[in-house]
Amino acid sequence: MVFRIASSPYTHNQRQTSRIMLLVLLAAVPGIAAQLWFFGWGTLVQILLASVSALLAEALVLKLRKQSVAATLKDNSALLTGLLLAVSIPPLAPWWMVVLGTVFAVIIAKQLYGGLGQNPFNPAMIGYVVLLISFPVQMTSWLPPHEIAVNIPGFIDAIQVIFSGHTASGGDMNTLRLGIDGISQATPLDTFKTSVRAGHSVEEIMQYPIYSGILAGAGWQWVNLAWLAGGVWLLWQKAIRWHIPLSFLVTLALCATLGWLFSPDTLAAPQIHLLSGATMLGAFFILTDPVTASTTNRGRLIFGALAGLLVWMIRSFGGYPDGVAFAVLLANITVPLIDYYTRPRVYGHRKG
C-alpha cells in the first residue's frame, strides 16, 4: 500500500462557493413566488434585468482585469447580488433603475474592492441605497397587494410599464397604485410612518385597507413568511448559521415590543416590524452574507443584534420607512471591530 504525503489542511469542506450561492438562490424561490403572487409579474422582469446586468457587468470588469470570466461567473455571486437587489425594489420601477443599481453594486461595491471576498459592504444593499437616495419617489412607488388593488397589471402590461411608463390602455403608475379605497397605496411601514406624522392615531391607521391582513398587513405578511420559509431551509441545509437571524429578529422584536408598550400611539406593534418590509429577507438572505458579516459566533450575535436595533430605530425615528439596507451597511462598518474583540483565544494563551 502506498501512502501519499500531503500538506494540510486534511479536513475539507466539500461545499464550494458556487454550491452555497446556488442553495441561497433556491431558497429565494418561496419569497419570489409570494412577491409574484401579490405584486404581479414586474418582480420577474426586474429579476431578469438584474441578472443579465450583473453577469455582463462582472464579465466586463473581469475582462478588464484580465481574469478568468467563465470561472468567476460560475460562482453565482453576481446572480445572487442581482436577485437580492431586484426583489428589494418596486416591481414596476423603470428598467434603467435596476440596471443602474445592479451595475453599481457589482462594479463599484464589489469588483472595485477586488471581487468576491474582498468587499466590506453588501453589494446589493449598496446598490439599493444609491437608488433610494437618488430616486426616492420611484423607489417608494410600490403597488398595492392584489388583495386591495383595483388594477392588477398582467405580464405584458408589466413589461410596458417598466420600459415605457404606461400600459397598453394608457394607464400609468398613479393608476396602478390605487387601492380599493381609491387612494394611492404604499407599504405598511411607509403608510404607518406617514400617517403618524400626519397626526393620525394608531387605531385609525389600523383601519386602513393595507392593514387588512391577519398579522401585519395585506400581502406583506405572507411575503415575509415566504422568505422565512426559505431562510429556515437554508438553516436546515447548513448554508447559513443561526446566530445572525436569531439575534436580529429577537432584538427587533424586543425593541418593537418595548417601544410599543411605552408609546402605543406613535410606534408600530412588533408584528408589523417582524412581518412587513424586508425583515425576513434581511434576516436570512442579506445579513448572513459570509463576506460582510462577522466571522465569530459571538460576533455574529452582536452583529445581528446591532442590525436589529438599527432597523427599529430607523423605522421608528428615521426618515425612511424600512431601514434594513441602511442598518446592514452601518453594521458592516463595525465588523472589523466586532471580530477583533470577539476572536477566540489561541489554545494555551492566557489573558493579559
UniProtKB/Swiss-Prot annotation:
Q: What is its EC class?
A: translocase
**Main subcellular location:** membrane
**Keywords carried by this UniProt record:** Cell inner membrane, Cell membrane, Electron transport, Flavoprotein, FMN, Membrane, Phosphoprotein, Translocase, Transmembrane, Transmembrane helix, Transport
**Where, per the database record, does this protein carry FMN phosphoryl threonine?**
187
Where is it located? Cell inner membrane
State the Gene Ontology BP annotations: electron transport chain; transmembrane transport
Job of this protein: Part of a membrane-bound complex that couples electron transfer with translocation of ions across the membrane. Required to maintain the reduced state of SoxR.
Quaternary structure (record): The complex is composed of six subunits: RsxA, RsxB, RsxC, RsxD, RsxE and RsxG.
Query: Which family, according to the similarity comment?
Result: Belongs to the NqrB/RnfD family.
Name this protein carries in UniProt: Ion-translocating oxidoreductase complex subunit D
Q: Which gene encodes it?
A: rsxD
